[in-house]
Amino acid sequence: MSLIQEFKAFASRGNVIDMAVGIIIGAAFGKIVSSFVGDVIMPPIGLILGGVDFSDLAVTLKAAEGSTPAVVIAYGKFIQTIIDFLIISFAIFMGLKAINTLKRKQEEEATPAGPTKDQELLTEIRDLLKSQQGK
């Protein structure tokens, strides 16, 4: 099998395609969450904390000199990134929890019930016939 044929077989597997779709949707979801945090969540929090804009929070290590930009630690952006992460993690957790609940329900439905009355009766008849043959 040539390298190209092997790659086609690999890429056409369902799991690889599902993973690719998941990555694309995840990237789009990440942008939505970042916008939600930066544009919806952080402004009211900043207002409550006295008009603080978290994206501007930084510690200047070295001031700008001429054309050389300042050296800063932008911890406000880091705080926003942490909140993004927490929201995305919670959304993924809730999604997985829902999927696991559905899987459990399907497994419970697939579990066969005990023997039916007909099966129990046939088992009793079989046992009686075996006991009569043994006499």
From Swiss-Prot:
Transmembrane segments: 9-29, 79-99
Keywords associated with the record: Cell inner membrane, Cell membrane, Ion channel, Ion transport, Membrane, Transmembrane, Transmembrane helix, Transport
PROSITE patterns xrefs: MSCL
Entry membrane topology: Multi-pass membrane protein
InterPro entries for this protein: Mechanosensitive_channel_CS (IPR019823), MS_channel (IPR001185), MSC/AndL (IPR037673), MscL_channel (IPR036019)
PANTHER family documented for this protein: LARGE-CONDUCTANCE MECHANOSENSITIVE CHANNEL (PTHR30266:SF2), MECHANOSENSITIVE CHANNEL MSCL (PTHR30266)
Name of the featured protein: Large-conductance mechanosensitive channel
Source organism: Aeromonas hydrophila subsp. hydrophila (strain ATCC 7966 / DSM 30187 / BCRC 13018 / CCUG 14551 / JCM 1027 / KCTC 2358 / NCIMB 9240 / NCTC 8049)
